[in-house]
Swiss-Prot record:
Protein name in the entry: Proteasome subunit beta
One MF annotation (Gene Ontology) recorded for this entry: threonine-type endopeptidase activity
Primary enzyme class: hydrolase
Catalytic function, reaction form: Cleavage of peptide bonds with very broad specificity
Annotated source species: Methanosphaera stadtmanae (strain ATCC 43021 / DSM 3091 / JCM 11832 / MCB-3)
Propeptide: 1-9
Compartments, as annotated in UniProt: Cytoplasm
GO cellular component: a single term: cytoplasm
GO terms of biological process kind: proteasomal protein catabolic process
């Protein structure tokens, strides 16, 4: 399996709301045309009010998330304050530039300046944005986001849009499927929703 095949699967979405950020993914992991795992975790909490999604090689993604968690903890010990989302985006960019991680990630969270979101690709380039999607199912997810998203929505409204976007990708992209992961970050912290809670959100679509 080559590196391009590693990057084929996955759909993730993220966007900024008036009171925080919403992140969502599906859970299918593929190796070429094989569904290797139906419950792959692509949503991570890397600090109290910072989350990330990943698309790409699983081992690289797990390694990158572990490094970011360690760097954030070290920063807090040294500086006695939280790392900003902007600083974390720069740090992640430098890590990606220093070695070949075949990972595309969305970093998002809430800091003293409010809610922020960045998309980073394997080359280390990083882009601030209000909404985005990554992975093979992203064209379908973007269709929903372009139609439903606006910067005035709350996270309560955003949860439904995120699940709708992931559902659209799962219905059309063979590399995306199985289950959902949903996280909401506000000034109070990050909440990762259970399957039962997500099922209730789906009923409202």
């Amino acid at each position: 399996m080559n590196q391009t095949e590693n990057m084929e699967g996955t759909t993730t979405v993220g966007f900024v709301c008036t009171d925080g950020v919403v992140l969502a993914t599906e859970t299918r992991a593929t190796m070429g045309s094989l569904v290797a795992n139906k419950n792959a975790d692509k949503l991570f909490q890397i600090d109290d009010k910072i989350g990330a999604t990943i698309a790409g090689t699983v081992s690289h993604a797990q390694s990158l998330m572990d490094i970011l968690k360690a760097e954030i903890s070290l920063y807090k010990l040294r500086n006695e304050k939280d790392m900003s989302i902007d600083a974390l985006a720069v740090l992640t960019s430098n890590i990606l530039k220093s070695r070949p991680y075949y990972v595309q990630t969305i970093l998002a969270g809430v800091d003293k300046d409010g809610a922020k979101l960045y998309t980073l690709d394997p080359s280390g380039s990083y882009i601030p944005d209000t909404f985005t999607s990554t992975g093979s199912g992203s064209p379908y997810a973007f269709g929903v986001l372009e139609d439903r998203y606006n910067e005035d929505i709350t996270t309560e409204e955003g949860k439904k849009i995120a699940i709708k976007a992931i559902t659209s990708a799962m219905e059309r992209d063979v590399y995306s499927g199985n289950n959902y992961r949903l996280g909401v970050i506000t000034k109070d912290g990050m909440k990762i929703y259970t399957k039962e809670e997500i099922a209730q959100i789906k009923k409202q679509l």
